[in-house]
């Protein structure tokens, strides 16, 4: 029992001794830092005459600076002039420099003189490029006039006339980028080739080219693309009576309704004329059989789909039958105009509306079924 207090006393004394020694060491370190004096030794150094160490003046030692900024700059030698002279200093040889500078100025003045002609030539070439479509339209109109006059004068010019008319419409279509207006003229151009096969008499063969010469005029006279496909057909109607010949007027109507034997298919081998007859004959499937699978455009497919859905196609097909029986050519022209307008309106409006109506009906049925199921639950 007595050993415990003794052990505690010994520990306390040792701690106090160590703490006191630590305080003394800290005091010595602080004294050295503040006064910068080493502790006094037991013996003193011998006294030398002269200034003490702290009284001697500080002598700087010269050291080499390795940086470029510390190196002294050499004076510029006349043989090797500086690469980048100061701009403020005038040149040493003004005569030579002036003679050298002047050619550069002349060269700079000559450069724009060379560039100006190039700009002028560019400006002159641009109007030529812009005038090309106008020239093309004027040439196409001239060709149309020439074809109409040549057809009216001679009968044996029948073969070149349809070619000219078929070549003429594409030029105005290029100038007027309107798909509906371009789809309408081929219907009018389709009329001439079939009657040429049905009417084998020479006067009648001279007549169809007149009808072919008439249709190309509407695309030239109707440059407005926004108008629907019907207006160009209405404008195409007046040129047919302007011919005022009985044969051509009778030839304008039959192409829509005549289920002609395979002879017209042999005569109508042109792609434009072959693709158009199925467009005009919407209801009867016989003309489509007569045409021997030409590279028809997607337009005929639209026309075949339209008459099936719309009931208005039946009266249009019945009207031309009466026109065939009637001998008066004037009635045939009127009926042909009406049928053309109806057939063109159908493909533009019917297919899209039918698809939309079917889709809406399907959605309504689904909604009704869902509502019924919810109510039953």
Curated annotation (Swiss-Prot):
Location of the region described as Disordered in the Swiss-Prot/TrEMBL record: 70-100, 150-355
Chain intervals with Low complexity compositional bias: 184-214, 230-283, 330-348
Role description: May function in a protective capacity by promoting the clearance of bacteria in the oral cavity and aiding in mastication, speech, and swallowing. Binds P.aeruginosa pili.
Record keywords: Asthma, Glycoprotein, Repeat, Secreted, Signal
Tissue: Expressed in salivary gland tissues and only in those that contain mucous acinar cells (e.g. sublingual and submandibular glands) and not in salivary glands containing only serous acinar cells (e.g. parotid gland).
Domain of life, source organism: Eukaryota
Native source species: Homo sapiens
Protein name, entry field: Mucin-7
Post-translational modification: N- and O-glycosylated. Contains fucose, mannose, galactose, N-acetylglucosamine and N-acetylgalactosamine.
Biological processes annotated in GO: antimicrobial humoral immune response mediated by antimicrobial peptide; killing of cells of another organism
Cellular location(s): Secreted
Start-end of Pro residues biased regions: 73-89, 169-183, 215-229, 284-298
């Amino acid at each position: 029992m007595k050993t415990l207090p003794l052990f505690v006393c010994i520990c306390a004394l040792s701690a106090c001794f160590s703490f006191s020694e630590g305080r003394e060491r800290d005091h010595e370190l602080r004294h050295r830092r503040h006064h910068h004096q080493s502790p006094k030794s037991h013996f003193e150094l011998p006294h030398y005459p002269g200034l003490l160490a702290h009284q001697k003046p500080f002598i700087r030692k010269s050291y080499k600076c390795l940086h470029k900024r510390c190196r002294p700059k050499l004076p510029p030698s006349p043989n090797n002039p500086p690469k980048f002279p100061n701009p403020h200093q005038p040149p040493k040889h003004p005569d030579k420099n002036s003679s050298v500078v002047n050619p550069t100025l002349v060269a700079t003045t000559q450069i724009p003189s060379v560039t100006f002609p190039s700009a002028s030539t560019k400006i002159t070439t641009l109007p030529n490029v812009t005038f090309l479509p106008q020239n093309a339209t004027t040439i196409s109109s001239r060709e149309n006039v020439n074809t109409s006059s040549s057809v009216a004068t001679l009968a044996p010019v029948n073969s070149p006339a349809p070619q000219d008319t078929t070549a003429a419409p594409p030029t105005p279509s290029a100038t007027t980028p309107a798909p509906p207006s371009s789809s309408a003229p081929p219907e009018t151009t389709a009329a001439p080739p079939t009657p040429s096969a049905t009417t084998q008499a020479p006067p009648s063969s001279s007549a169809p080219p007149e009808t072919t010469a008439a249709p190309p005029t509407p695309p030239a006279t109707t440059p407005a693309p926004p108008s629907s496909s019907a207006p160009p057909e209405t404008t195409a109607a007046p040129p047919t009576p302007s011919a005022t010949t009985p044969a051509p007027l009778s030839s304008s109507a039959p192409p829509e309704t005549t289920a002609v034997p395979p002879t017209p298919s042999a005569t109508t081998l042109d792609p434009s004329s072959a693709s158009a007859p199925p467009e005009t004959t919407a209801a009867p499937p016989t003309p489509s059989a007569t045409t021997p699978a030409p590279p028809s455009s997607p337009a005929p497919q639209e026309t075949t789909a339209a008459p099936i859905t719309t009931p208005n196609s039946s009266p249009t097909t019945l009207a031309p039958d009466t026109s065939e029986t009637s001998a008066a050519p004037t009635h045939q022209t009127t009926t042909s105009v009406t049928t053309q307008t109806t057939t063109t309106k159908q493909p533009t409006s019917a297919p899209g509306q039918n698809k939309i109506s079917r889709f809406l009906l399907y959605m309504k049925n689904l909604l009704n079924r869902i509502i019924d199921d919810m109510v039953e639950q």
